């Protein structure tokens, strides 16, 4: 334990918190252009073809982003909005594309949890 005198001379160092989403640069979302749209397989206990895309962000970062929901309209040169949020069974995928923003369309025929997939309220 440090004495009061020692703490007066040299205060305690603040702990630096490392960001889980460095490419966002402390912003809630970032815009980017798809450089590659492809599918990849998840880690060991799971099996699927997960839809992901490589995105070149406006700040120069190139990141891998997950495309949630059933079906998508993204291709190379599509402009997308990226938010934070990793995909646990895809190593290196730390971002999600925002559905229903910019060039990324919302999910078709989605009735529940619509706000997460960029779907307007259906005409009852």
Swiss-Prot record:
Membrane spanning stretches: none
Job of this protein: With S4 and S5 plays an important role in translational accuracy.
Gene Ontology biological process terms from the UniProt entry: translation
Record organism: Vibrio cholerae serotype O1 (strain ATCC 39315 / El Tor Inaba N16961)
Alphabetical keyword list: Methylation, Ribonucleoprotein, Ribosomal protein, RNA-binding, rRNA-binding, tRNA-binding
Presence of the UniProt keyword Ribonucleoprotein in the record: yes
Domain of life: Bacteria
Subunit structure, interactors included: Part of the 30S ribosomal subunit. Contacts proteins S8 and S17. May interact with IF1 in the 30S initiation complex.
Alphabetical list of Pfam families matching this protein: Ribosom_S12_S23 (PF00164)
Assigned protein family: Belongs to the universal ribosomal protein uS12 family.
PROSITE patterns documented for this protein: RIBOSOMAL_S12
Protein name: Small ribosomal subunit protein uS12
Keyword Ribonucleoprotein annotated: yes
GO molecular function, one term: tRNA binding
GO cellular component, one term: ribosome
In-chain residues carrying the UniProt-annotated modification 3-methylthioaspartic acid: 89
């Amino acid at each position: 334990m440090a004495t009061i005198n020692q703490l007066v001379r040299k205060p305690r160092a603040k702990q630096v918190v490392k960001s889980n989403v460095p490419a966002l640069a402390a912003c809630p979302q970032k815009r980017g252009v798809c450089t590659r749209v492809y599918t990849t397989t998840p880690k060991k206990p799971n099996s699927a073809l997960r839809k992901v895309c490589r995105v070149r962000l406006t700040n120069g970062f190139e990141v891998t982003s997950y495309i949630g929901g059933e079906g998508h309209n993204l291709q190379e040169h599509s402009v997308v909005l990226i938010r934070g949020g990793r995909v646990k069974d895809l190593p290196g995928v730390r971002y999600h594309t925002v559905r229903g923003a910019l060039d990324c369309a919302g999910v078709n025929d989605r009735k529940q949890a619509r706000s997460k997939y960029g779907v307007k309220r259906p005409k009852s």
